[in-house]
UniProtKB/Swiss-Prot annotation:
Role noted for this protein: Specifically methylates the uridine in position 2552 of 23S rRNA at the 2'-O position of the ribose in the fully assembled 50S ribosomal subunit.
Reaction(s) catalysed (UniProt annotation): uridine(2552) in 23S rRNA + S-adenosyl-L-methionine = 2'-O-methyluridine(2552) in 23S rRNA + S-adenosyl-L-homocysteine + H(+)
Localisation per UniProt entry: Cytoplasm
Organism: Shewanella loihica (strain ATCC BAA-1088 / PV-4)
UniProt name for this protein: Ribosomal RNA large subunit methyltransferase E
Gene3D superfamilies, A to Z: Vaccinia Virus protein VP39 (3.40.50.150)
Length: 209
């Protein structure tokens, strides 16, 4: 029965994907994923990235967010991206492939950042979903906690943070931790985020720790 459910669910996802307005629009605009529209919508509302800024993009593959970030940061800016999956090169993006949960990968990422502080940390990271909430939610919360730790290590005063979080156990505590670190925290559900998804984006500005 579970195999049939998974098959039905997969079929539904594929149908949704190919019928999806944002998938078609991303292909038309030469964007690597529909996720690009999420950061684009956030940028329109919150103006996180400006020319000359340094941006770290966690969970970057296939590159939708990095495409938008490098365009906004411009030639004087810098985008450093990381993902466990490979990513085709993007002009102006310094990409590191590796598991962000591993200390050696974190250290390699910090090396690429160097002594300069980062203006914006972006995280669209998500674990491989098993479909079991009791397994998936803790994994997802662990990743967003690592992203917040990254902010504490590299973010400049008054810097910004945009992170995908799945609503569920641990969400309220995480929101509290983000509020302690930033002056303003807003919850965004972009139009391009699928309605039935539990994902929301926390957009935090004014880093103060």
């Amino acid at each position: 029965m579970s195999g049939k459910k998974r098959t039905a669910s997969s079929t539904r996802w594929m149908q949704e994907h190919f019928d999806d307005h944002y998938v078609k629009l991303s292909q038309k605009r030469g964007l690597r994923s529909r996720a690009a529209f999420k950061i684009e919508e956030i940028q329109q509302k919150d103006k996180l990235i400006r020319p000359g800024m340094t941006v770290v993009d966690l969970g970057a593959a296939p590159g939708g967010w990095s495409q938008i970030a490098v365009k906004l940061a411009g030639e004087t800016g810098k985008v450093i991206a990381c993902d466990i999956l490979p990513m085709d090169p993007i002009v102006g993006v310094d990409f590191l492939q590796g598991d962000f949960r591993e200390e050696k990968v974190l250290n390699a990422l910090l090396e690429r950042v160097g002594d300069a502080k980062v203006d914006v940390v972006l995280s669209d990271m998500a674990p491989n979903m098993s479909g079991t909430g009791g397994v998936d939610q803790p994994r997802a919360m662990y990743l967003v906690e690592l992203a917040l730790d990254m902010c504490h290590q590299v973010l400049a005063p008054n810097g910004s943070f945009a992170v995908k979080v799945f609503q569920g156990e641990g969400f309220d505590e995480y929101m509290k931790a983000v509020r302690e670190a930033f002056t303003t925290v807003k919850t965004r559900k972009p139009d391009s985020s699928r309605p039935r998804s539990r994902e929301v984006y926390l957009v935090a500005t004014g880093y103060k720790l």
